[in-house]
Amino acid sequence: MRLVIVAVGQRVPDWAQTAWDDYAKRFPFELKVELKAVKTEPRGSKTVEALVAAERGRIEAALPKGCRIVALDERGTPLTTLALAAKLQNWQLESDDVALVIGGPDGLDPAFKQAAHERIRLSDLTLPHAMVRVLLIEQLYRAWSINANHPYHRE
């Protein structure tokens, strides 16, 4: 099974890339984590609808065939770390690849969010996109560690 993080935006600060790389290498062989960064649509005179529609096309092209799509959305279902661990365990039992999708500056296309298998919220706070990548991979690693009885997570 693979966890594929599809994120709109290609450039992140060095600290975010370093943190991503650190967590990505911690995952076990049987749970691969992959980042697919897609280009942000250039801002200008385009409407928000046109921008997110263009980004949607890039996101869909980056998705693995037949994957479970989980959209990160500020109005998605809030999760605790333990609830995320339970979701991860279920995803692993289903054995399908899971794509967790992080939108661009204007979020995700509404139709894409509606079509996703799930919508989750990482926080009630508005976070920078680089921080979302790091927070997401850390929480996925923490969820794995809970399920594997690894000492990383402590109650």
From Swiss-Prot:
- What CDD domains does its record include? RlmH-like (cd18081)
Regarding protein family, the annotation reads: Belongs to the RNA methyltransferase RlmH family.
Which chain positions lie within coiled-coil regions? Answer: none
**What protein does this entry describe?**
Ribosomal RNA large subunit methyltransferase H
Origin: domain of life? Bacteria
Pfam name, any one: SPOUT_MTase
List the catalytic activities from the record: pseudouridine(1915) in 23S rRNA + S-adenosyl-L-methionine = N(3)-methylpseudouridine(1915) in 23S rRNA + S-adenosyl-L-homocysteine + H(+)
